[in-house]
């Protein structure tokens, strides 16, 4: 049985190291009991059933580095089934689009192409009886998200009638033939959690953990890549809780009422894992359930706009004549995309359950180094080093 358990754990660790990497690290279930001697103070093996034991024997501190690198979080859009905008254009005649209608939301349940999240932090743990840890991390995170333009509700107005774009005109075209990507700045991040070695039998340990993490970065760069409307914004600002039509100065540098695009990241996780100690090496395998959300309050960000029309252009978008042979003289703004905007919808986990494999290297029962890979619900790697005081 022992040989079988050793083989299973070593095989899992090897498979995780060469397979695809993936929420929050599960960690080694043996962590609370691996470092039994202190670097500064000598460790005390306290027995909770000993009437002479004191809290000084029961409590110890560990500290170290915590690095978590999510290369591809599997996310989807959390948006309603309908989206309010102008009616879909039909035929060849221009028109005014001033009445809102509920249309099928192209962002509903849309999957993102890529989502990355990187965290570097300091780690401190309060250990009780060499069995339970209560820990926190303080550090910094930054991220990257990429998806189809439909996932960000990229919309615009095309085929508008008249010699001006009225303030009550609504976008009438959903643009799904593009890609939108955003980069966040590096900002403060923190997490708290608990981990316990619940059952031990010889060199095997079964444990469980719980964690919560939070960060609130701002969008540093927004790139919209679409053949009819392409733009890039540094530190973009937009409108929160504002329905269409957007203000007439939307997209102008001096626009009023805009707010910074900020993403509120939350994540909960519970996990269980099994480890087996082989001298200084402690491989482990585990499962975790996590739920992550990235919420930007559905902020709407407008394409940069010229304060006044230049050569009948309100933005630097290409003309789309289609089968027409000349630009209309009566409908001056009908042949290129107007009042383009995108919306940063709420993202959430598409898959909740994942598998974790990893190993811890222990030195003199005072120092340890852990490497971990997470699979299925994300591709991520984790590395941490810690010592006991």
Curated annotation (Swiss-Prot):
Residues 1-23 form the signal peptide. Belongs to the chlamydial porin (CP) (TC 1.B.2) family. This is Major outer membrane porin. The lineage of its organism: Bacteria, Pseudomonadati, Chlamydiota, Chlamydiia, Chlamydiales. In elementary bodies (EBs, the infectious stage, which is able to survive outside the host cell) provides the structural integrity of the outer envelope through disulfide cross-links with the small cysteine-rich protein and the large cysteine-rich periplasmic protein. It has been described in publications as the Sarkosyl-insoluble COMC (Chlamydia outer membrane complex), and serves as the functional equivalent of peptidoglycan. Permits diffusion of specific solutes through the outer membrane. Pfam families: Chlam_OMP (PF01308). One of its GO terms (molecular function) is structural molecule activity. It comes from Chlamydia pneumoniae (Chlamydophila pneumoniae). InterPro entries: Major_OMP_Chlamydia.
